[in-house]
Amino acid sequence: MRPRLLLLTPPFVQTNTPYPATMHLTGFLRSRGFDVFQRDLSIKVVRDILIDYGGDEAEEILELLSSPKVPDDDKVEASRLIDELALEICDQVDASFGFSRYAERISAQAADFGAIEKLIRLRGVMDRPLARHLKEAIAETRPTVIGVTCPFPGTLVGAFKIAKYVRRHHPDIRLVLGGGFVSTELREMTDKRPYTYFDDFLFDEGYAPMLKLLGEDATVKDMPRFVAPCYDGIDWDEYFDVVETENPMHRLWSVGRWRKLQMARGCYWHKCAFCDVILPYINCFEQPKAAEIVDAMEDGCGYHFVDEAMPPALIRQVSEEILRRGLQVEWWGNVRFDLSFTPELCQLMSKAGCIAVTGGLECADDRLLKLMTKGITLSSARKALRAFHRAGIMVHAYLMYGFPTETEVEAYGALEFVRGLFKADLVQSAFWHRFALTVHSPIARDPGRFGIEIADAADRRVTQRAKRTLFCRNEIPFIEPGAPDWDAIGEVLNLALYNFLEGRGLDKTPADWQRLVRRRKRATGK
């Protein structure tokens, strides 16, 4: 008898559209002849929580936020009310509850499973609705295997609460945990306690590992280059927008029922020193035929490509195929700001329905871009951004500060460069990320080259003891002698960027923002 699978998304992820992992794995396994079902418990549980504590008013607000007929601008006040309700639940009922995450901070730093297990055992706002929907899903699908995706720290507790319920009520069902968080954080796990909840932990893309678990011979090389998602079991009417800004680029992550696709597997560059390029799901680059991708775009109108970076040559082919078929679609996704994005290619993308791109400018400094092997320069990036602008394609830039050897002067030089991009309308949205050293990055393999020392290597006794009960390990502490005060610099960068997003302060210098931060600190006594 072949196994029957139920694939689950645990609480909590974004509310406007389903997280794609189960849809792609469902489509793949069904193509191999398996009985597979899926449920998004995240959206079901968060709706129940909000209605349980907000009553009829919350239900009416969610109905308004779910409606495609209500303009985004009219959803701003409703979004504010639902945000306030979520904060009230967090303050008065369950301090771990977040609108699209649960106990995220603890989960992100959980080297020891003990802190997580306390939250798993502690009853919180999700427990009752989660049990109700699990009971219903298992009764409907009668699975022999349940697979749970854990893409982010904010889904970790929810995933293990699912396992706790299934262990108690259906001990014969095999439990499997996979997803992005598992692939990056749990590769070095030595603690045995998580195995009392899950039977198996799968790393990287789930296609080949899941087939092996189900008893079939499979290697990564045997897997298809493109997998069409299956939407059976997804109720699109349950999802709702959260409109927190007037910035149209910034809204894309929280507004709209985007169907998520992957144009290519892995990253075609996979050289950035800060990235987890050692991991197979990033460095195994494969790209399908454009027709396969566009086939999956025939049944909808809005798509978000969740690639590490969409390959320009494939983007061209996909755009041409969309136009050849006469499809009326909108799409956006992640790119690298390199010279492949010519004005001609960007115009073609726009005609084919591309409305926005996101990409990394990182530290926005040529010395640092070279040091991190980013493969772009400020000049080449500006040319690409200008081409997107002229084609009417919006841009979000990922920014970084605190990179090893970065100076205060370079950080404020980057701020000035970014200010110029906003003033010229070459970017419409951005976000500063503070550099984090991850164990799977080239920097972690050769820290001396970047002027840093890995901090936990200093106390080998503690490190060896911790290794025996290690749960999560991805971000690792480091020491950089003489580094600037990145906490203080980060305040300045983030204040300036917040204003840029709203179209304010575009004539202010870095020194102006520094003075403003100092005045605020004096006024608040901090």
Where are these regions (language model features)?
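Radical SAM enzyme core and accessory elements
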Residues: 2-10, 24, 30-31, 45-65, ...
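Flexible loop/turn segments at secondary-structure boundaries
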Residues: 13-16, 45-46, 153-157, 183-185, ...
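Conserved Radical SAM active-site core
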Residues: 44-46, 50-51, 58-143, 189, ...
